[in-house]
């Protein structure tokens, strides 16, 4: 899935190696144990923000594994991630729609429940994450702004 706009891609393609490059991120367990690739979608949004020089909203949090097709996949430990976001002062959390069953349990015990100061939104794909997180110029949607291949 290539989401980089043509003008930015042209700048990046001025590198050698037949104008081909890719980004591969490996997050080994190391000193801090991790339970799966929960940061995949957040890392993808951060890289796109950096490469395209589009700022992100700093009042949001995001979790979800990202597939090679740009789908946001379910993760473990959603309850602690939502609780952590709320405790950190986050206003809006995005999480995989495939974790909807987990979110229903969380919504039963969130105190106070979701309101203008805190909400959780389920997402299916990277475009929904980009639409929520990035301050995309010209009031365009991610689908309009980013080049699809």
What are these regions (language model features)?
Residues 1-149:
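Peripheral, non-AAA+ core regions of ATP-driven protein-machinery
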